[in-house]
UniProtKB/Swiss-Prot annotation:
GO terms for biological process: lipid transport. Gene3D superfamilies: Plant lipid-transfer and hydrophobic proteins. GO terms for molecular function: lipid binding. This is Non-specific lipid-transfer protein 5. Keywords: Disulfide bond, Lipid-binding, Signal, Transport. Belongs to the plant LTP family. Residues 1-24 form the signal peptide. InterPro entries: Bifun_inhib/LTP/seed_sf (IPR036312), Bifunc_inhib/LTP/seed_store (IPR016140), Plant_nsLTP (IPR000528). It comes from the Eukaryota. Disulfide bonds join 28-75, 38-52, 53-98, 73-112. PROSITE patterns: PLANT_LTP. Plant non-specific lipid-transfer proteins transfer phospholipids as well as galactolipids across membranes. May play a role in wax or cutin deposition in the cell walls of expanding epidermal cells and certain secretory tissues.
């Protein structure tokens, strides 16, 4: 548990440093806060928790403009890069497992500039 919290803090700090946001865009702090309950699933754990899916749905609702969606994408891309044991299949499957559709794949290789 302590290790998960430490990793979540590292992800939060990395997102704030690596992905500066345009004015008015969703913040990396909000993205990582919403998705921090997903860390166990993203590193190969069992299916996403209700708290994780709640965060995914909250993030989807908050990212309602193209700049917000691009900012959220960049934050998730940066966060994914900093998770050393990221299970890429779980990351890509997360939205579907939570019953939502996002307009891009959660991946370190996603081109967030193409997100509309």
């Amino acid at each position: 548990m302590a290790r998960s919290m430490k990793l979540a803090c590292v992800v939060l700090v990395m997102c704030m440093i690596v992905a500066p946001m345009a004015e008015g865009a969703i913040s990396c702090g909000a993205v990582t806060g919403d998705l921090s309950p997903c860390l166990t699933y993203l590193t190969g754990g069992p299916g996403p928790s209700p708290q994780c899916c709640g965060g995914v749905k909250k993030l989807l609702a908050a990212a309602n403009t193209t700049p917000d969606r691009q900012a959220a994408c960049n934050c998730m891309k940066s966060a994914a890069s900093s998770i050393t044991k990221l299970n890429t299949n779980n990351a890509a499957a997360l939205p579907g497992k939570c019953g939502v559709n996002i307009p891009y794949k959660i991946s370190t290789s996603t081109n967030c500039n193409t997100v509309k």
